[in-house]
Each structure stands twice: as structure tokens, then as C-alpha cells.
Regions:
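Extracytoplasmic/secreted proteins, especially bacterial periplasmic and envelope-associated proteins
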Residues: 7, 11, 34, 38, ...
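Structural recognition of the beta-strand scaffold that forms the well-ordered cores
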Residues: 1-3, 23-27, 48, 66-68, ...
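Glycine-rich, aromatic-lined ligand/substrate-binding cores of catalytic
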Residues: 164-165, 169-367, 372-396, 403-446
Length: 446
């Protein structure tokens, strides 16, 4: 069954349905314009539900569900499904916050269900090739990683307009809100722009981090970071009046994560993430005319070693190996890209058929035992961003004479945050720990 039948849910259902039977569809907006109607027409024999809980109660023959809903509802839906013994495929990021990722990882292991996160790049031949280069130590010890994206491609960094809007007649807005606080309907959230608001989305980092950071995280065997810090871009809609929108994600950000050495790389690593159109400069060994990462340098990764650089685009595609005094090695993933989604979905389906812990299960590239800690690491960046933007109840008022006064220093979370990953705790700034999890409406616990 597909929970979330529009948008990405519509796309992936078409893919895995070529191998399996779709017996149910679920979406809070039955006649939504972003693919829900298409899904219902394509699978006319599938029972349709608005409430996922009703679907899980009624459909006794279900084996597995895909979850393609806004980030803030991933955990509550997935936990309900797994606790019923259902296998689950969840879009990236796995969850809305760090605590939820830890909980889902434990539930999956307890119930021995087959899981996969929808970061399809993990199944690319590009990641396999990068792993080969890392294992052979072709650029020596890797000490720095740059990763970046052109996201957001939705409005972000501004206040939400307070216009009164009429809710679409068939949209169940209360179900769409899920664990988030009750609020009036706005088209500024549904069906797409929810990504830029912390109650529902995870910003540019949450949207693309699991796609872009998968290659270095996996190939270098990274785990929890030791610390994190960030800076964010400023937006001024009026002179000397900086936007302060703590409920919304910033227009751009830079996040720095540090990791200890691993069994795959005998060096500490500094990982620098950039979004909002920011990207690194050309490092040594990469010719000035070469794109960084993918074409036009819009998204990418640079892994900086002692004697060279590994570059790739989103999903680990198109990796290149640059070494001093040697010809650049390029590995083409053009053909594989055409089947990337299908390969990722079929890993999950084959794992279900073979069973939890089977050889086929071990071929799954993003089961929750991997995707959970990985998502925690990605969302550490968002914890730092939210801490950076946190300053208490007072909204700052800037003027030419007060821009650098003590009022500006109220942003008390602008520091390096030290992280105890095993215990999910910031050890040097307790206020930031409120962003490890979230508050939930009654009836929406996981």
C-alpha cells in the first residue's frame, strides 16, 4: 500500500507496482492535483483511505507500505506500520528530528521488518566506485569533505503571509497537520512549501542531505559527529531590519560537522555543508574550468585527501578522481541513472521476499540500522541551525546605532555544540536539546 499517493508517492508506486500488487492507497487529499487522482485512476481496484490508521486497521492482507508524506508525519506512520509487523519504505529524510530516527531504528530491529529509506543514490554504481577508490586509498587519508546544494527552490527565510484562505473541500487538514500544533489551512504549506517550516519540514539540508551526504558517510564509515556549528544567511526586507523567523528555515546556511577517525579512514574529518546557492571554491588538483560535483556545480561533494580529490554529484553520480600529476579518472553513471529508482525499490522488495537477515536483505543499501544513524547525523545540522536562530522571546530590533550592541548577543546558541551521540545530548548548551525531539499533539505519539 502507498501512504501518500501524490507527488513522490505516485512516482514510486508506479515503479514497485510493476512487481507487486497495490491493494490500498491513502492520502489526506483524495482529489489532490499532485498525482493523487492519477494514482487512483491507475489502480482502480485499490481501496482508498484518507486516514492511514483506518487503512492499517482494515487491510488485513497488507505486507508492506511506502510512506511519501511530509517529513513531520514519517515517524508516526512508520512506527504504527512496523509495530503491526509491516515492512516499510520511507522517503528521506527518514524522520523530522533526531529522536524519531533513533526510535524508528529500534522499532525496526525489534519487529525484524525489512526497511529502506528513499535515498536512491545509495544504490548507485557511483557510490560503489567511490568506495573502491577510498578502500584503495588512492588519495590517501581524507580529512575534509565539502557538500552543497542549490536548494531551497521554495520560498524560505521570510515570514508566512497571514491571508485567510478557504481549505480545499476534500482535504483533511487535521490529518495533514498530524503531530504539529493545530493551525488554519494555508496554501503556503500544502502541497509543497511545507519544507521551509520547522514544524513540518527540515529545510534544504533535510531535503537533500540524505541524497548528497550518503556517498561520503557510507564510504568513509562515519558515525555520530563529535560537534557541530553553523552560520545562516541574513534576509533584510527593510533597511536595518533583519528578518527574524525562528519558525522558518533560513535562506542559506553553512554547517560544519567533525568526526573521529574510522576503520575506513585513519584521519579525523571536517565536513562542511552549504546550501542556498553557496558552494566551495576549487580545491587544488581540480582544473579551473571543471564543474564541481555535477554539471553547473549545482549539487555535489568534494572529498579532500592527502594526494587528491574525489568529486561527485547528487546520489554519488558521475564520480571523478583527481590526483596531482595524473590524468583525471571519470566513472560514467549515465546508464545506471535511468534505473536508479527501480533498483533501490527492488532491493527492498527482494529483501521482503527473502526475509529479514537474509542475503537479499543484506543487499539493501539504506535499511534503518544504517538510515537511522545517518539521518541523525544529517539532522544534527538542523539542530545547530535552530540553536543559532534561538534567542528567547524578544524579536531583535536593529538600527545603525545598535547593530553590534548587547541586543545582538541574545543569540545565545551561536556556538560550537558538543554532541554526545550515544545519549542524543548537547553537553555544553542545554537549551539546544529541545531540538533533539519535538512536542506532539495528543494522539500522535510514536
Amino acid at each position: 500500500a502507498a501512504i501518500g499517493a501524490g507527488g513522490k508517492g505516485n512516482d514510486i508506486t508506479h515503479d514497485w507496482a510493476s512487481a507487486e500488487r497495490v491493494i490500498a492507497l491513502c492520502d489526506v487529499h483524495p482529489d489532490g492535483t499532485h498525482g493523487v487522482t492519477d494514482s487512483r485512476k491507475t489502480y482502480p481496484n485499490a481501496n482508498f483511505y484518507v486516514d492511514f490508521r483506518e487503512m492499517l486497521d482494515n487491510e488485513k492482507d497488507l505486507d508492506a507500505v511506502t510512506i511519501s508524506t511530509p517529513d513531520h508525519t514519517h515517524a508516526v506512520i512508520a512506527s504504527n506500520a512496523m509495530n503491526r509487523g509491516l515492512h516499510v519504505y520511507v522517503q528521506k529524510p527518514l524522520t523530522h528530528n533526531i529522536e524519531e530516527a533513533r526510535v524508528l531504528t529500534k522499532i525496526a530491529a525489534k519487529n525484524k521488518v525489512v526497511t529502506q529509506m528513499g535515498n536512491q543514490g545509495g544504490s548507485s554504481t557511483g557510490v560503489v566506485k567511490i568506495q573502491e577508490w577510498v578502500d584503495k586509498k588512492l588519495i590517501g587519508k581524507i580529512h575534509k569533505i565539502y557538500a552543497w546544494t542549490n536548494r531551497p527552490v521554495w520560498p524560505q527565510g521570510f515570514d508566512m503571509e497571514s491571508n485567510e484562505e478557504e481549505k480545499p473541500a476534500n482535504l483533511n487538514w487535521d490529518l495533514w497537520l498530524g503531530p504539529a500544533a493545530s493551525t488554519k489551512y494555508t496554501s503556503q504549506l500544502h502541497p509543497f512549501n511545507w519544507r521551509g517550516w520547522w514544524d513540518y519540514g527540515t529545510g534544504a539540508l533535510g531535503d537533500m542531505g540524505c541524497h548528497i551526504l550518503d556517498a561520503p558517510y557510507k564510504t568513509l564509515g562515519l558515525h555520530y559527529p563529535t560537534d557541530v556549528e553553523c552560520s545562516v544567511g541574513q534576509v533584510f526586507q527593510q533597511a536595518w531590519s533583519q528578518n527574524y523567523v525562528p519558525k522558518g528555515c533560513p535562506a542559506s546556511s553553512i554547517v560544519t560537522l567533525n568526526f573521529d577517525k574510522t576503520s575506513k579512514n585513519d584521519s579525523k574529518i571536517e565536513l562542511i555543508w552549504m546550501d542556498g546557492g553557496l558552494r566551495p571554491s576549487h580545491p587544488e588538483f581540480i582544473p579551473a574550468d571543471d564543474f564541481l560535483g555535477e554539471e553547473n556545480s549545482t549539487n555535489g561533494v568534494l572529498m579532500i585527501g592527502e594526494t587528491g580529490v574525489i568529486s561527485c554529484g547528487v546520489y554519488g553520480l558521475g564520480p571523478k578522481l583527481y590526483r596531482k600529476g595524473q590524468e583525471t579518472i571519470e566513472f560514467s553513471t549515465d546508464d545506471y541513472w535511468k534505473t536508479l529508482d527501480h533498483t533501490h525499490h527492488m532491493e527492498w522488495i527482494n529483501g521482503i521476499k527473502a526475509g529479514y537477515g537474509s542475503d537479499e536483505y543484506k543487499k539493501i543499501t539504506a535499511p534503518f540500522e544504517y538510515a537511522g544513524p545517518f539521518t541523525e547525523t544529517v539532522l544534527m545540522g538542523n539542530l545547530a541551525i535552530r540553536s543559532y536562530m534561538s534567542m528567547g522571546k524578544d524579536k531583535p530590533k536593529f538600527s545603525p546605532n545598535r547593530y553590534h550592541t548587547s541586543e545582538y548577543s541574545k543569540f545565545v546558541g551561536r556556538k560550537k555544540l558538543l554532541w554526545d551521540g550515544e545519549n542524543m545530548k548537547i553537553t555544553n548548551f542545554d537549551e539546544a536539546n529541545k531540538f533533539v525531539g519535538r512536542s506532539r499533539r495528543s494522539g500522535w505519539n510514536i
